[in-house]
């Protein structure tokens, strides 16, 4: 026996069950379109670390930085962590991260890549 709810598709039902509202999803989409993202490379004790910086921590929380970090690490097959409002990924993945962020809904013109390498 199949139950059908009028006016709702499977995604709506799943969102309701998991607690994600349309407003939260809409706010996250708007934030992604407006967010300014800086991608830079640091050299730490001979190893490269790619930093994806989202500016302030409130914007990062609205963007769902934890889920984003998990997805980036999985897609890049690299380790990483979250610090305040930025994601650290092991290795030089600047161009790949830019492509992935565009796929996730960020605007290309709002993603800035620093070409230099910072020594720390």
Curated annotation (Swiss-Prot):
Top-level division of the source organism's lineage: Archaea
Output the Pfam families linked to this UniProt entry.
SUI1
Q: State a single Gene Ontology molecular function.
A: translation initiation factor activity
Arranged from A to Z, the UniProt key words for this protein are: Protein biosynthesis, Translation regulation
The record's section on InterPro entries has: SUI1 (IPR001950), SUI1_arc (IPR022851), SUI1_arc_bac (IPR005872), SUI1_dom_sf (IPR036877)
Q: Which PROSITE patterns match?
A: SUI1 (PS50296)
Tell me a GO biological process for this protein.
Answer: formation of translation preinitiation complex
Q: Where are the transmembrane segments?
A: none
Tell me the protein family, please: Belongs to the SUI1 family.
Please state what the protein is called: Protein translation factor SUI1 homolog
């Amino acid at each position: 026996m199949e139950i059908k709810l009028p006016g709702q598709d499977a995604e709506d039902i799943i969102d309701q069950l998991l607690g994600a509202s349309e407003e939260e999803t809409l706010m996250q989409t708007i934030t992604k379109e407006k967010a300014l993202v800086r991608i830079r490379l640091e050299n730490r004790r001979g190893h490269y670390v790619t930093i994806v910086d989202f500016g302030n921590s409130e914007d990062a929380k609205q963007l769902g930085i934890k889920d984003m970090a998990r997805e980036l690490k999985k897609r890049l097959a690299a380790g990483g962590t979250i610090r305040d409002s930025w994601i650290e990924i092991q290795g030089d993945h600047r161009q790949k991260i830019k492509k992935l962020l565009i796929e996730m809904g960020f605007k290309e013109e709002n993603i800035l890549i620093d070409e230099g390498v910072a020594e720390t």
